[in-house]
């Protein structure tokens, strides 16, 4: 029976199409590292700076394009305005494959989401973010594009204001629609901003309602602590991953499994990745291989030279999705997630370092069942 399931899921992977929907924006990154922080407070001055880097941002670009680079068949679903920034987003995506823009919707009513990333001399990055079209992305934008797909991944519900309206009912309806078509569902998060709409949601109440319709949920340590362990997050901040041990991860992922997911996990940055799975019947219900049922593991990160961590969590999710869809062992799934994240952080942007699935497997010595 195990062999039958394994072969069945392997065949499904070869024919699969993954939809990545949600947050999509353009990052504008001016080179201002030569300007001291104090000079930013001096109004009316002309400061000579370096060139601006233009990069795609958000889960749709980061996870979606990582999946594309790994060789998966992927559809990107987002919303852009009919404006110059929207044109830039479309052009940047089309450089990878013109077909990838087929499900990017355009609108005349909302300006395209963007962020300006500023890193003054000797300081950490600051983000100036315009929600725009990301906040306006609606359920119908996604459900229109589900035909023929086998997996739906939604990136960053805290930023998807329209989907989170009315106690996240549009988001929940979208997930239900996907599962009713026998699609596997997953979501990725961001840390809620206490000064923005995402910081006003009652996550301890809403998350169980959402996760009842999610099959795979692997947030970062900071994200899940901010949502379900706010006291710990207040103490640890973005260094949560350094404080989480086996017992903490086991208990927290146990809560996520009780909320309904089939595969729960925590992305732990330089400390690796923890995964825990539900029982056999739940995995079959999620269209996932039952051979990984009732397991848990902690996979250490791979030692690489880090140039930038932008998109590392998104890249990790891409590796996890590919491994799960190919019915690999839980060890292989976790290793592939960590390996794709390792490739990501070796470059300054989110996608440039991602290699093909074969190249990634060979480089990191990851076992693969054909």
Describe each PLM feature range.
Residues 96-99, 200-227, 290-295:
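Structural recognition of alpha->loop->beta junctions
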Residues 166-173, 199-206:
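Charged helix-capping and loop-helix junction motifs
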Residues 3-79, 84-98, 300, 305-307:
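Glycine-rich phosphate/adenosyl-contacting loop at the front of the ribokinase-like
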């Amino acid at each position: 029976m195990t062999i039958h399931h394994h072969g069945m899921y392997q065949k499904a992977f070869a024919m699969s199409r993954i939809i990545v929907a949600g947050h999509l924006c353009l990052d504008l990154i001016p080179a201002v590292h030569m300007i001291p922080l104090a000079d930013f407070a001096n109004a009316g001055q002309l400061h000579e700076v370096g060139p601006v880097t233009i990069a795609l941002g958000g889960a749709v670009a980061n996870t979606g394009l990582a999946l594309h680079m790994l060789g998966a068949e992927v559809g990107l679903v987002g919303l852009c305005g009919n404006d110059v920034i929207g044109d830039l987003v479309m052009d940047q995506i089309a450089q990878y494959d013109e077909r990838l823009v087929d499900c990017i919707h355009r609108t005349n009513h909302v300006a395209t989401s963007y962020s300006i990333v500023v890193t003054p001399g000797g300081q950490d990055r600051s983000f100036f973010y315009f929600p725009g079209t990301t906040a306006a992305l609606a359920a119908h934008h996604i459900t229109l594009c589900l035909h023929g797909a086998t997996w739906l991944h939604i990136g960053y519900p805290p930023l998807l204001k329209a989907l989170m309206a009315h106690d996240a009912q549009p988001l929940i309806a979208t997930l239900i629609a996907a599962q009713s078509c026998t699609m596997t569902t997953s979501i990725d998060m961001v840390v809620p901003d206490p000064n923005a709409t995402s910081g006003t949601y009652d996550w301890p109440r809403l998350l169980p309602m959402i996760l009842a319709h999610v099959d795979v949920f692997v947030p970062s340590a900071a994200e899940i602590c901010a949502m379900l362990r706010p006291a710990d997050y207040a103490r640890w901040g973005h260094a949560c991953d350094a404080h989480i041990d086996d017992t903490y991860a086991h208990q927290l992922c146990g809560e996520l499994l009780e909320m309904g997911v089939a595969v729960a996990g925590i992305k732990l940055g330089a400390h690796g990745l923890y995964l825990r799975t539900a029982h056999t019947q739940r995995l079959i219900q999620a269209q996932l291989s039952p051979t990984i049922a009732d397991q848990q593991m902690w996979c250490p990160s791979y030692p690489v030279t880090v140039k930038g961590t932008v998109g590392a969590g998104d890249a990790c999710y891409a590796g996890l999705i590919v491994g799960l869809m190919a019915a690999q062992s839980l060890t292989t799934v976790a290793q592939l997630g960590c390996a794709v994240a390792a490739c990501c952080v070796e470059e300054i942007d989110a996608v440039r370092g991602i290699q093909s699935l074969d190249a990634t497997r060979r480089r990191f010595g990851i076992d693969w069942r054909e």
